[in-house]
Regions:
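Lipid interaction determinants
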Residues: 1-144
């Protein structure tokens, strides 16, 4: 990486460092379709955290959270709903002018461990939008 490219990457990294609260999560099938709330509720609950050392974590939970009849003893149906109502992973990240790439070290879904999650993003002040903005977008607000 050239010194100029390294300076640009560092500038992008400095801008993204912090804790970001998930404000909305929307999907659609094509650019001509209307946006619909992602399956985690409207609004969903979650945080994306990016630190200065290049580590990050993402957690998203269904709103309202899945209830269970007997605390600490979910039925198989309740356990599946809990699993399907939560996304979490952590690892390291790199960033450039257009993408955040998250190298997943651990995740609620073991199939993601070892994967690289490449996410296009746009940053404007304290608002971060992650997604291609054609079929998906996750809007976050910087926590102060």
């Amino acid at each position: 990486m050239t010194s100029k490219a390294n300076t640009g990457a560092n500038r992008h990294k400095q801008a993204i460092i912090g804790t970001w609260k998930l404000i909305s999560a929307e999907d659609r099938n094509s650019a001509s379709d209307p946006w619909v709330p992602y399956t985690f509720g409207n609004p969903p609950s979650g945080y994306f955290i990016y630190d200065a050392t290049g580590h990050g974590s993402i957690q998203i939970m269904t709103t309202p959270p899945q209830s269970i009849a007997t605390p600490d003893s979910p039925t198989p149906v309740e356990a599946l709903a809990i699993f399907n109502g939560y996304i979490a992973y952590y690892g390291t990240y790199t960033i450039d002018a257009t993408n955040i790439t998250e190298q997943v070290e651990g995740a609620w879904d073991p199939t993601q461990v070892g994967s690289a999650q490449v996410r296009p993003y746009k940053l404007s002040g304290d608002t971060l939008i992650i997604g291609d903005q054609i079929t998906y977008k996750r809007t976050l607000q910087r926590v102060k």
